[in-house]
């Protein structure tokens, strides 16, 4: 799996959670693993059925920490998403003046360079569920 400034994201069409995690762990150290879906009406946007504006993961957490006089110190070099349950919600990508949109289905994955490529979401999340892994890159 090769991410570069010219190709800051990779789409994987057919995989399973086990193989996905094994490949992602080769890229670095996980700093957080979570489930993204529509679980409520309050809190983080990643757990609500709502559009999400283009962003780099960690921006919201850093802003919320700063509001409380705290710091957010997790490194999120790579964002890895595995689709546990598909849906109609569109994942939007934006990098270096380019854009792409993908509707993830079960067994598909996205690996995104979180320093180059912003992402967002539009459309109804419904019961779509993603496994999200934040990765701090291995020293190169």
Language-model-derived ranges and their functions:
Residues 1-21, 33-140:
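Active-site environment of non-heme Fe oxygenases that use a 2-His-1-carboxylate facial triad
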Residues 27:
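Active-site donor-binding segments of glycosyltransferases and PAPS-dependent sulfotransferases
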């Amino acid at each position: 799996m090769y991410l570069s400034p010219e190709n800051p994201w990779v789409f994987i069409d057919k995989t399973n959670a086990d193989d996905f995690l094994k490949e992602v762990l080769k890229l670095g150290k996980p700093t957080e693993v979570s489930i993204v879906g529509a679980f409520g009406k309050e809190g983080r946007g990643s757990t609500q059925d709502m559009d999400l504006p283009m962003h780099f993961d960690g921006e919201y957490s850093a802003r919320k920490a700063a509001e409380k006089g705290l710091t957010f110190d997790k490194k999120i070099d790579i964002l890895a998403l595995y689709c546990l349950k598909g849906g109609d919600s569109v994942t939007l990508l934006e990098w270096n003046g380019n854009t792409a949109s993908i509707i993830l289905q079960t067994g598909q994955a996205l690996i995104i360079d979180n320093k180059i490529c912003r992402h967002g979401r539009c459309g109804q999340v419904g019961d779509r569920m993603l496994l999200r892994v934040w990765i701090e890159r291995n020293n190169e």
